[in-house]
Structures are given as structure tokens and as C-alpha cells.
From Swiss-Prot:
Residues 654-685 are cytoplasmic. A motif (CX6CC) lies at residues 576-584. Disulfide bonds join C148-C169, C161-C174, C354-C357, C354-C584, C576-C583. This is Envelope glycoprotein. Residues 1-41 form the signal peptide.
Length: 685
């Protein structure tokens, strides 16, 4: 078994810490857990790096208003568009410019009302740049500018280049990009800033006169900028024009990452297929048809700012109702039911009468390396993105398909290594049917070719199997049979992964191939098991995400206790039977039984009746009266000793009396003989 690294670290057993914690420590722990569970949403670090999300690049002015943005659905840190904010939109509401009364909303209009020339002449001199009338905007387009960064500077550079009062360009050599002739083409900054259009002065004047704002910038990300992960907090620059007075503006670039956009509410054909909650996992519901995204249409009322921005791809999402999440009992029972369907398709004889048990502590899943065929796709809907990543598999076995730079400690899991074609358009690498990618960054249903780094990361295609233990029917009956006391042997358990491998082929390594290409019953069982696995992984990931910012040891303890509480509720509710630290469900050919404790009681009663029929009349005394056995074993010794004394006592006493009388008679005879011998001697004299 191999531990596949991930962001969620598994720690050793921490039960000894519980006995060392005082009541005050428990109070602090409860407060900490309340803060963790009641905190905000999941951070970006908890997300699957291959999962597409809504990325919004924003350009903010000095006033903090968003003057330009663009959106797309892509994996994080893979989409680097060209940003095109207008200079006059950045200068709106600034007292240092000639449009202090123009807010951001008016700057986004098709043709904002120009200030009257009388007021404009008071603010700027003839021949100066500005935003209040067409000629001033046109002169701006032909001017040179330079850009200085605020972030990423050392203390000495910050003192030398100044702050907002100088737009971070207090001295020369602080600028990093721009249109100046003295600037190098290769920028050492995170971005490069140029003019978006290079038209002649006359054409520029006509364009500025017709469309209002006409000075969009062209901001591109450098290779250094694409490696930075600090765009979420935003980075700020100062832009100054190489003209008299060096006027300028400040702008901030920020990335906003959110989940997939919510679907609209309305009539849809998929609603017809929805019914009451399913009572069986025999077949999954049919997938709704996917619709191609409609082409984006230009808006006749769009501004020059809007037309210069990149139009994001619009995707039509299938409407679904917000169904409540499954309860703990339904989720765990569906997991057992899916395991039964898969096991019944591979080894029907094993499911005639048995118990399938869920363990309280991790690991909850084990993986078998798979060698199924993979496919490339640009359709992100083909991936099961509902399940987050960042989960670690502690037990991976078998031989399967690997990609990336596999370390020496994991090469025995690979019988084939695949190279990813990362060039070209962005694509997703889909695993074979019912498979996952177990990567060094965590568990993921799909791989993004733009995110995956072949020189650093590695992934193994695996078949996920829940850690479910198999016991024959007699094991639970013996564990709960208190009417027949005897020394019980330790129960021998088999995991579901071992049973699937033994039921299909002779080994787990080759058995994984049969899991991919099996009969129709097996495919249906695997589909049902996959649905249950997805629901359970989502619940586990939610627990990990809420606790990720806390101590790793605390996360593991709470996560283990959380599954233990789930199983405890099932056991106390009579839905499963407890065997050591496992929650067991009764299985027969009809499937998993929800009321397993009731089924166990029926089995025990039936076994008791059969045993009573085969017993003699005196054997029933010991079964009907347990105290009689204890009383008899207590007084049996003294009774046997008393009986022996009564039987053998008279004989022993008689023998002893006879022996004493014999000895007394012998003594008397000796005394008489001595007297008679003396008289005889006297007569002879």
C-alpha cells in the first residue's frame, strides 16, 4: 500500500491527547470549532486546481471603482487576457484632470457629453492633453507615457520612487513599461502597457469625436506575471504622460475567482424527468442533452470601451431544481447499496446472506490503479466537477496508467506512462469510465492541460473503492448471541476491493481491467456505486475545507469523529449493527436492509428456536435459568465432599475401632503371659 501525497495530511492516532485536556481546554476547543465551522466560504487553496471557475479580471481606478472587466469560465491561473481600460475612464472623478464631475457610470456611456469649451479652456491650456473634448483626447493618443509599479518594490526602491503623490515615479529608472523610446522591449515587471490602437492623428481625431472615449490601453501579462498568485488581492501601478506637468492616473488590476454562475429559474424539459427521491440505485437517471453555446452577438449600443474588451464565452446551463442534500443515513446507505450491486454482479454467491460494514475511522477509500483508455475534450461539462479535490488516498495498489514525473517510490504502480500534449488550446484529460485521477495535488475527476506540470506533478488513474468490510452471516450472529456463551474467535474480514478483485479475476492488478470492461450488470453496479461515492466525497470534502485553516491534528480528530458520529446515529437508530468499530448492514439477494438491527434480532430469535428444539429437557434448565448454573457450580464442591463423608465415613470409623481393639487385646495377652510364666518357674523350684 502506498500513501499518495496531497494537501490533506494524515496524522497518527491522537487518542492520548484527549485524556490530557482539562475542562478549560475543551471549552476553548469548542469555541475554536465554532469559529471554524461558522467562518466564511472555502478558500481558493481548498479547490480542485483543474476545476473551471468563473474568472473576472477587473481594472480599478484611483477611486476604487471598476472601470473595465472581462469574464470567462476557465481553471484558475490559466486564462491571461489582454486588458483594455480607457485612460479617461481611469481619470473620471479625479480633481487633477479636467473631468472631475464625471463618474464611472457616465464614463461608460457611448458618447459622454463633452464639457462646454468655456469650462474646458479654464482647466487646460491649448495644446494640452485631457478628456473633456475631442481634440484633447486626440492629443492624448499621440502622447508617450511610462508606468511605475507600487507593489513588489524593496524599501530602498519605495523611498526613491515615492508614493501616490508622484504615482510611484518620483525619479527616473522607476518606470518598468510604457511607450517611451528609452524603455526596453522586455519588461521586468508583471505586465506590459501600450496603446491599443496605432492610427494616424487625423483618423484618431475623427474616432475620438465620434465615439467619445478613444484611448484604450493594451495591458498584457508577462511570463513573470503569469507565475504570480497575488492577483486576487490586486496590484497597483501609476501611469504618467511624458508631457509638460507629467499628468497621470493610478490603476489596479485584480482577479476575482468565484464558483460557476448560478442557473436561471424557468421551464425546462429536464424538470419532467425529476421525480420523488429514489428508493433504489439500480440505474442512474439519464443525462440531459447538452446544448451548444450560442454565438455572442454585438450590441449596437456598446461603447468603444465595451467593444475593446474581450467578450467572454457565454454558455447555456441546463436548469435544475435545488434539491436538498442527502441525509447522513441516505448517503451512507446508498454507499452500501452501491457496493452490494457491484459485488452481486461479480460474485453473486457472496451476497446470498452477509453483512457489509462501514468503518468509523479513516481511510474511507482505497484505490486500484487502472489501465483504461483516456480521452481529450474541451467540454468541461463531461467532468464531475461537483466533487472537490484536495483529498488524499492512503492506500493505492495495483498497476495502471500514470502521467507526469512519477517518483521512484510510486513507479511500481505504473505499467504505462503517458505524456500530455500541453501545446495548443486548453483541453481536459478525461479518465476511463468510473475512474479518477489520483494526483500529487489531490483527487480530481479531470486534468487540465494548462494546469498540469509534467516536470513536477504526477497522476495515477485509479478505480475508487469505498473501505467496506465483508462478513458472513454467522459472524454477527455469534457476536450478538449471548445465550450460548463461549470463547469467540476474532472475526476475519475482507474488504470490498479484495472481493471485487477475487470475484472478477485472480488478482487485483488485472481485476481492475475487468472493472472497466465488465458485463452490463457490473457497469450498472459501478455506476450506482460511483453516484454514492461522489455524494460521500462531497460531504468529506466539505468537512476538510471547513477545517483546513485549523491545525492538521485537530482536522483529523474532528474528521474522524464526524464519521463516527454519523455511524453512531445509524446504530442508535437501529439502521445498522455494531461490530467493534464498524457499522454493519445486512445483505441478501434483494439488496441492503435498512433496518439491520431488526433483521439481526429476527435471525437471533430464529437461531434460538432452532437450538431449543435440538436440546434435551434438562439442557433447557441452564438456558431458561442462568442463575441456576452459577448456583450449581458454587455448591457442587461442598455437596460432593459431604456425600463422600457420608458414604465412606462409617467404614473408616469401624476399621479404626477394630484396629484399636486388636491392639488393646494384644497388650492384655502379653501381660497375662508374663504372670503365668512366673508361677511356672516357682513350681519347678
Amino acid at each position: 500500500m502506498v500513501l499518495l501525497p496531497g494537501s490533506m495530511l494524515l496524522t497518527s492516532n491522537l487518542h492520548h491527547l484527549r485524556h490530557q485536556m482539562s475542562p478549560g481546554s475543551w471549552k476553548r476547543l469548542i469555541i475554536l470549532l465554532s469559529c471554524v465551522f461558522g467562518g466564511g466560504g472555502t478558500s481558493l487553496q481548498n479547490k480542485n486546481p483543474h476545476q473551471p471557475m468563473t474568472l473576472t479580471w477587473q481594472v480599478l481606478s484611483q477611486t476604487g471603482d471598476v472601470v473595465w472587466d472581462t469574464k470567462a469560465v476557465q481553471p484558475p491561473w490559466t486564462w491571461w487576457p489582454t486588458l483594455k481600460p480607457d485612460v479617461c475612464a481611469l481619470a473620471a472623478s479625479l480633481e487633477s484632470w479636467d473631468i472631475p464631475g464625471t463618474d464611472v457610470s457616465s464614463s461608460k456611456r457611448v458618447r459622454p457629453p463633452d464639457s462646454d469649451y468655456t469650462a474646458a479652456y479654464k482647466q487646460i491650456t491649448w495644446g494640452a492633453i485631457g478628456c473633456s473634448y475631442p481634440r484633447a483626447r486626440t492629443r492624448m493618443a499621440s502622447s508617450t507615457f511610462y508606468v511605475c509599479p507600487r507593489d513588489g518594490r524593496t524599501l530602498s526602491e519605495a523611498r526613491r520612487c515615492g508614493g501616490l503623490e508622484s504615482l510611484y515615479c518620483k525619479e527616473w529608472d522607476c518606470e518598468t513599461t510604457g511607450t517611451g523610446y528609452w524603455l526596453s522591449k522586455s519588461s521586468k515587471d508583471l505586465i506590459t502597457v501600450k496603446w491599443d490602437q496605432n492610427s494616424e492623428w487625423t483618423q484618431k481625431f475623427q474616432q475620438c469625436h465620434q465615439t467619445g472615449w478613444c484611448n484604450p490601453l493594451k495591458i498584457d501579462f508577462t511570463d513573470k506575471g503569469k507565475l504570480s498568485k497575488d492577483w486576487i488581492t490586486g496590484k497597483t501601478w501609476g501611469l504618467r504622460f511624458y508631457v509638460s506637468g507629467h499628468p497621470g492616473v493610478q490603476f489596479t488590476i485584480r482577479l476575482k475567482i468565484t464558483n460557476m454562475p448560478a442557473v436561471a429559474v424557468g421551464p425546462d424539459l429536464v424538470l419532467v424527468e425529476q421525480g420523488p427521491p429514489r428508493t433504489s440505485l439500480a440505474l442512474p437517471p439519464p443525462l440531459p442533452p447538452r446544448e451548444a453555446p450560442p454565438p455572442s452577438l454585438p450590441d449596437s449600443n456598446s461603447t468603444a470601451l465595451a467593444t475593446s474588451a474581450q467578450t467572454p464565452t457565454v454558455r447555456k446551463t441546463i436548469v435544475t431544481l435545488n434539491t436538498p442534500p442527502p441525509t447522513t443515513g441516505d448517503r451512507l446507505f446508498d454507499l452500501v447499496q452501491g457496493a452490494f450491486l457491484t459485488l452481486n454482479a461479480t460474485n453473486p454467491g457472496a451476497t446470498e446472506s452477509c453483512w457489509l460494514c462501514l468503518a468509523m475511522g479513516p481511510p474511507y477509500y482505497e484505490a486500484i490503479a487502472s489501465s483504461g483508455e483516456v480521452a481529450y475534450s474541451t467540454d468541461l461539462d463531461r467532468c464531475r466537477w461537483g466533487t472537490q479535490g484536495k483529498l488524499t488516498l492512503t492506500e493505492v495498489s495495483g498497476h495502471g496508467l500514470c502521467i507526469g514525473k512519477v517518483p521512484f517510490t510510486h513507479q511500481h504502480l505504473c505499467n504505462q506512462t503517458l505524456s500530455i500534449n500541453s501545446s495548443g488550446d486548453h483541453q481536459y484529460l478525461l479518465p476511463s469510465n468510473h475512474s479518477w485521477w489520483a494526483c500529487s495535488t489531490g483527487l480530481t475527476p479531470c486534468l487540465s492541460t494548462s494546469v498540469f506540470n509534467q516536470t513536477r506533478d504526477f497522476c495515477i488513474q485509479v478505480q475508487l473503492i469505498p473501505r467496506i468490510y465483508y462478513y458472513p452471516e454467522e459472524v454477527l450472529l455469534q457476536a450478538y448471541d449471548n445465550s450460548h456463551p463461549r470463547t469467540k474467535r476474532e472475526a476475519v474480514s475482507l474488504t470490498l476491493a479484495v472481493l471485487l478483485g477475487l470475484g472478477i479475476t485472480a488478482g487485483i492488478g488485472t481485476g481492475s481491467t475487468a472493472l472497466i470492461k465488465g458485463p452490463i450488470d457490473l457497469q450498472q453496479g459501478l455506476t450506482s456505486l460511483q453516484i454514492a461515492i461522489d455524494a460521500d466525497l462531497r460531504a468529506l470534502q466539505d468537512s476538510v475545507s471547513k477545517l483546513e485553516d485549523s491545525l492538521t491534528s485537530l482536522s483529523e480528530v474532528v474528521l474522524q469523529n464526524r464519521r463516527g458520529l454519523d455511524l453512531l446515529f445509524l446504530k442508535e437508530g437501529g439502521l445498522c449493527a455494531a461490530l467493534k468499530e464498524e457499522c454493519c448492514f445486512y445483505i441478501d439477494h434483494s439488496g441492503a436492509v435498512r433496518d439491520s438491527m431488526k433483521k439481526l434480532k429476527e435471525k437471533l430469535d430464529k437461531r434460538q428456536l432452532e437450538r431449543q428444539k435440538s436440546q434435551n429437557w434438562y439442557e433447557g434448565w441452564f438456558n431458561n435459568s442462568p442463575w441456576f448454573t452459577t448456583l450449581l457450580s458454587t455448591i457442587a464442591g461442598p455437596l460432593l465432599l459431604l456425600l463422600l463423608l457420608l458414604i465412606l465415613g462409617p467404614c473408616i470409623i469401624n476399621k479404626l475401632v477394630q484396629f484399636i481393639n486388636d491392639r488393646i487385646s494384644a497388650v492384655k495377652i502379653l501381660v497375662l503371659r508374663q504372670k503365668y510364666q512366673a508361677l511356672e518357674n516357682e513350681g519347678n523350684l
